[in-house]
Amino acid sequence: MFFTIYHSGVRSRRGKEFVAALFVLFGLIWLAKSVGNIGLLILGIALGVVFHYFSFGFAGFWRQAILERKTIGMRSHLLLLAIGAVLFFPSLALLPNLGFEVSGAIRPLGLNVLIGAFVFGVGMTLVGSCSSGTLRQMGALNWRFYYVFLWMIIGGTVAAAQMDFWLELPTLGTFSAAIDIPWYFGLLMHLAVILGLYYLLLQWERSEFDSVEPLCNKENRLFLSPLVLAALLLAILNYLILLVSQYPWAISWIFPKLGILGIQALSLPIDWEFWEFVGQNEVALSKGVLDDSIMLTSLGMVIGVSLAFWGQVFLYGKEKSEISESKSFCGGCEQIKSLALTAITGALMGYGAVIAFGCNVGGFFSGIISGSLHGWLWMFSALLGMTLTLFVGRQFRSTKAPA
């Protein structure tokens, strides 16, 4: 049996656009009255707009650097980490002494991070997106990623059930260059590492191309690549999330949260070590979806992408191919194989993100700008997982190619 998504005809286009606009308007009004913290929802919406408008991402930029040696995306990530650290390091060190309760994404440096990030990197490569990228695709109505998201929830929930095992693995404890040493020394060390990595990326691209695509472009009116502005805005938005919610931007914890809410809806017993570990057992499970800070920013991101997406449709009359084309959701052996592979890789991403204390957002971005060493371990392990997966995939394709 086939389930197919169809694009509407041109004659009914304007009417449906008007109905969609009304639906979005009423939905936003309802959300504004229902959410526990409207500020976090707005910040999430802003994140979605920035990601979509500037075509910013993580997984795609990493893949591009590894396969094509085009590093402008990864260099924009380093800029993001530099700007974020300038904002986070002094704040994490000084604000608590002034009576402001803020905490960084600081986690132990352990085998669970090494293994979890590697698993996430493998899944991210096969799916073609990370957690934030999945939310972005959902906002752009790419239906495949709703299926991916479902399996990320399943994988994250299974990881929650087994979290006590992962937390018993060897660990070196926590260390943050923002709070465990004078923050200004830590910031200088952080920026020095960023500068060194930036130089290595430049050399990596120069080994393939005569010239390197610059982040500062004289042909642009602002003399900057749009990725620079995106990095600046994302760092500021993450900092505002820290000030509003007392914790940096994160995504991956919504996977076990939604899974446990689903299990509760089915009246199944829950007594898992994961919720004891994060110290949020009763509080987290008692919070509604619209009262949870991580849920709000994640929901806001999907809404923000949708607003930016449909704004482009209304202004330019262009829709992405995944909406405008007719697509078969299920049918035939290839579709079944694709669904099975997507389920496995989505579950890998959800599982890996939870046991590694985060995804590209919570583990990589927020972890590193909080000065936590586990963030750097997360980055290198996820990159290793992606690199090996791409290498194995290339070898597999070459063996299947006709002589």
Residue locations for each model-derived region?
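Membrane-interfacial helix-loop segments of redox and metal-homeostasis proteins
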Residues: 1-403
